[in-house]
């Protein structure tokens, strides 16, 4: 299972099911947008912004229990900091493939949470 339920369960306790559902939907939308943006930043060799966006994605995905995505984002961040375009491209391809699957799994988890 790619989704660690512990941070999700804690957020539901903290903000309630309805608010969490809204936050999670926004997170899914934003994550998909960031993944696309990372590709553009890599193509533009905008290392600083690529690293910044990967860093933000790392923390956001970790907050929603998507630790595999967070780990890949950390690798992209490191590659960007070192200006290693080939390594960033490899990790971005992994991120793109994994994001679709993990976000679909998160969507399934959301269906189990009472709003």
Question: What are the language-model segments listed below?
Answer:
Residues 1-52, 56-115:
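Two-component system phosphorelay core
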């Amino acid at each position: 299972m790619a989704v660690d339920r512990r941070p999700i369960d804690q957020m539901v306790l903290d903000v309630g099911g309805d608010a969490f559902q809204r936050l999670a939907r926004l997170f899914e939308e934003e994550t998909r947008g960031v993944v696309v943006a990372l590709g553009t930043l890599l193509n533009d060799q905008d290392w600083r912004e690529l690293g910044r966006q990967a860093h933000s994605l790392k923390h956001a995905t970790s907050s929603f229990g998507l630790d595999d995505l967070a780990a890949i984002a950390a690798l992209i961040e490191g590659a960007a900091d070192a200006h290693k375009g080939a390594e960033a491209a490899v990790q971005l391809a992994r991120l793109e493939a994994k994001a679709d699957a993990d976000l679909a799994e998160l969507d399934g988890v959301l269906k189990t949470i009472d709003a």
